Amino acid sequence: TLAEASLQAQQVEVISRMIERNHEEIDDHDLSVIAGLIKQLSSNVAVWLMTEEEKRGEQ
């Protein structure tokens, strides 16, 4: 849903800001885990947007 995609995009933004502010305190392993989370959240948003675009193109 739009609400879910919006929430996931906001989560990516918050996580990214946390990395910017605290990058010196994050070790390589944690950074790898965080990158995986960002990838998952952002890909979910991208898939939703592409699906919606496809639906609108069919109308």
Report residues per predicted region.
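Sequence/structural signature of long amphipathic alpha-helices
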Residues: T1-Q59
